[in-house]
Swiss-Prot record:
Disulfide bonds: none annotated. ATP-binding (A) component of a common energy-coupling factor (ECF) ABC-transporter complex. Unlike classic ABC transporters this ECF transporter provides the energy necessary to transport a number of different substrates. One of its GO terms (molecular function) is ATPase-coupled transmembrane transporter activity. Gene3D superfamilies: P-loop containing nucleotide triphosphate hydrolases. This is Energy-coupling factor transporter ATP-binding protein EcfA2. It comes from Streptococcus pyogenes serotype M3 (strain ATCC BAA-595 / MGAS315). Its main location: membrane. The gene is ecfA2. Residues 3-245 form the ABC transporter domain. It is an enzyme of class 7 (translocase). GO terms for cellular component: ATP-binding cassette (ABC) transporter complex. Keywords: ATP-binding, Cell membrane, Membrane, Nucleotide-binding, Translocase, Transport. Its EC number is 7.-.-.-. ATP binds at residues 40-47.
Length: 280
C-alpha cells in the first residue's frame, strides 16, 4: 500500500489566537513495502505528518492519497475509517491507550470495533500478542499490572490485531532501556521483512541507519533533504547544524577524515565501518 502527499499544508487551531502553520507544501511518496524514516528537530512537523497518514488529521490544503483513496480538507470521518484500518498508528507512549480489564480483551477490542467477530478477534489477539513476545500466562492479567515494556508491546499488538498494511511508528521506543528498544526494533524489522510498510519517526540516527531504506529530513514544516540513509548521512555538517546528528560510526569516521585519513564515503553502520577499516 503506497501513500502520497501532494502539496500538503497543515495549520492548527485555525481562527484562534494560537493559529500556527505546522506544514508547508509537503510532497512525498511512501512506497509499498518500504521502511521510511522521518527525522527532524522538535516542532519540525514529523508527528503532524504521521497523524495525516491515517486520517487522524486532514490537510488544510493539498491531498493525502492512501492506496489511491484521497483525504482532503473536506473528507468526512466515515470516508476515512477504512484508511485507519489499513494504516495503524503507534503513538509515542501507546500504553496510555490501554483500558480493558485484561490483556486479551484489550488487544481484541480494535478488530471487533471494525466488525470482526469476537472469536476471530480473540484469535487475532492471541496471534499478535505472541508476535510481540507476550506469553500466554499474561493474557488474562490486567494490562496495568505489567511492566512498562510489556504494556508497550500489548498496545502495539492491539494495533497489529487490526491487520494494517502500513505501520506508522511515532518514537516507538521512547523511554525504553537499550535491551527493550532493540527487541522492539527487531519486531518491526521482522514485520517489514514479511511485507508490511513501516513508517518511523525517531531521533535515534542509528535506528535510521540500521533499519530504514529511505529518509525524509524535516525542518520548520518543510522537507529539506530526502534520500537513502547512506546519502543523507554524508551531510554531517548540515544535520549537526539542525541539531539532528548522525549515526555514531559516521561521527567517528568524520573525525578520522578531519585528522587526514581519507574515507571516500562515510560509513553509517558498524558493518560498513569494519569494511572501511579493513580495506583502508
Amino acid at each position: 500500500m503506497s501513500i502520497n502527499l501532494q502539496n500538503v499544508s497543515y495549520t492548527y487551531q485555525v481562527g484562534t489566537p494560537f493559529e500556527g502553520r505546522a506544514l508547508f507544501n509537503i510532497n512525498l511518496d511512501i512506497l509499498d513495502g518500504s521502511y521510511t524514516a522521518f527525522i527532524g528537530h522538535t516542532g519540525s512537523g514529523k508527528s503532524t505528518i504521521m497523524q495525516l497518514l491515517n486520517g487522524l488529521h486532514v490537510p488544510t490544503t493539498g491531498i493525502v492519497s492512501v492506496d489511491k483513496q484521497d483525504i482532503t480538507n473536506h473528507s468526512k470521518n466515515k470516508e476515512i475509517k477504512s484508511i485507519r484500518k489499513h494504516v495503524g498508528l503507534v503513538f509515542q507512549f501507546p500504553e496510555s491507550q490501554l483500558f480493558e480489564e485484561t490483556v486479551l480483551k484489550d488487544v481484541a477490542f480494535g478488530p471487533q470495533n471494525f466488525g470482526i467477530s469476537p472469536e476471530e478477534a480473540e484469535a487475532l489477539a492471541r496471534e499478535k500478542l505472541a508476535l510481540v513476545g507476550i506469553s500466554e500466562n499474561l493474557f488474562e492479567k490486567n494490562p496495568f499490572e505489567l511492566s512498562g515494556g510489556q504494556m508497550r508491546r500489548v498496545a502495539i499488538a492491539g494495533i497489529l490485531a487490526m491487520q494494517p498494511k502500513v505501520l506508522v511508528l511515532d518514537e516507538p521506543t521512547a523511554g525504553l532501556d537499550p535491551k527493550g528498544r532493540k527487541e522492539l526494533m527487531t519486531i518491526f524489522k521482522k514485520l517489514h521483512q514479511s511485507g508490511m510498510t513501516i513508517v518511523l519517526v525517531t531521533h535515534l540516527m542509528d535506528d535510521v541507519a540500521n533499519y530504514a531504506d529511505f529518509v525524509y529530513v524535516l525542518d520548520k514544516g518543510k522537507i529539506i533533504l530526502s534520500g537513502k540513509p547512506k546519502t543523507i548521512f554524508q551531510q554531517v555538517s548540515l544535520l549537526e547544524k539542525k541539531q539532528l546528528g548522525v549515526p555514531k560510526v559516521t561521527k567517528l569516521a568524520q573525525r578520522l577524515v578531519d585528522r587526514g585519513i581519507p574515507i571516500s564515503s562515510l560509513p553509517i553502520t558498524l558493518e560498513e565501518l569494519r569494511e572501511v577499516l579493513k580495506h583502508g
